[in-house]
Amino acid sequence: MAEENIIFVGKKPTMNYVLAVVTQFNNNANKIIIKARGKTISKAVDVAEITRHKFIPDAKYEEIRLDTETLQGERGSSNVSSIEITLSR
């Protein structure tokens, strides 16, 4: 899968990410991966649901992967949850 078919969800408004997903599907991508960590996990789920219900009804969940990543910081290591949602058409 090409790197351009991966959408990293962050601090921007939800609809920006929805637009990115819809644009990728309109550019003939068959699979899109939506990735998020920590507090943005709920936003990633919103992006997937808005995409499926309002813009691309024939999109299906192919895979949902949950994980815990260990990040090193100034105060030692911390565990951060992450999600990868794969949508296909």
Swiss-Prot record:
Gene3D superfamilies: Alba-like domain. SUPFAM superfamilies: AlbA-like (SSF82704). GO terms for cellular component: chromosome; cytoplasm. Keywords: Acetylation, Chromosome, Cytoplasm, DNA condensation, DNA-binding. InterPro entries: Alba-like_dom_sf (IPR036882), DNA/RNA-bd_Alba (IPR013795), DNA/RNA-bd_Alba-like (IPR002775). The modification N6-acetyllysine is found at K11. GO terms for molecular function: double-stranded DNA binding; RNA binding. One of its GO terms (biological process) is chromosome condensation. Acetylated. Acetylation at Lys-11 decreases DNA-binding affinity. It comes from the Archaea. It is found in: Cytoplasm; Chromosome. The keyword Acetylation applies. Binds double-stranded DNA tightly but without sequence specificity. Involved in DNA compaction. Belongs to the histone-like Alba family. This is DNA/RNA-binding protein Alba. It comes from Thermoplasma volcanium (strain ATCC 51530 / DSM 4299 / JCM 9571 / NBRC 15438 / GSS1).
